[in-house]
């Protein structure tokens, strides 16, 4: 499954699909980076996807464009978890590293808008 991890980690955007309690799928385009054997995503703590992951950690990932239109590749299933402060800081670094100046500027303005507690990292394991 390492090849799937590498393939997804190389994509500029991923369509992260989370699931409501009703089972309805909710797709969201996200930035993602590899951190060890997982993919990490950065999000506002109060975002719907974070709430849905708390209730059901099953997610799906596929390559997409900035608007969330699937571009290529197979959909991959995984399990997501909400990271602690240390994991969230590592996620910010991984995202900023992958996305360069755009990632760094985005992180900077996010801190200005609400500080580091406003956002949270999500780790996604696609090996199970």
What are these regions (language model features)?
Residues 1-15, 70:
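Extreme N-terminal tail/first-helix region
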Residues 1-6, 38-49:
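Short charge-dense sequence patches
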Residues 5, 11, 34, 91, ...:
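Alpha-helical protein-protein interaction elements
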Residues 46-128:
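Short, structured beta-strand-loop surface elements
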Residues 11-45, 60-63, 73-76:
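Short beta-strand segments
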């Amino acid at each position: 499954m390492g090849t799937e991890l590498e393939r997804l980690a190389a994509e500029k955007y991923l369509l992260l699909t989370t699931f409501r309690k009703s089972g309805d799928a909710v797709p969201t385009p996200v930035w993602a980076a590899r951190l060890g054997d997982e993919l990490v995503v950065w999000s506002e703590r109060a975002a719907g996807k974070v709430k849905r992951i708390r209730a059901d950690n099953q997610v799906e990932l596929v390559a997409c464009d900035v608007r969330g239109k699937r571009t290529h590749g197979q959909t991959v299933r995984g399990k997501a978890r909400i990271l602690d402060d240390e994991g969230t800081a590592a996620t910010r670094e991984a995202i900023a590293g992958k996305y360069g100046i755009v990632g760094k500027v985005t992180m900077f303005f996010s801190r200005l808008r609400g500080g580091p507690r406003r956002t949270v990292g999500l780790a996604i394991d696609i090996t199970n």
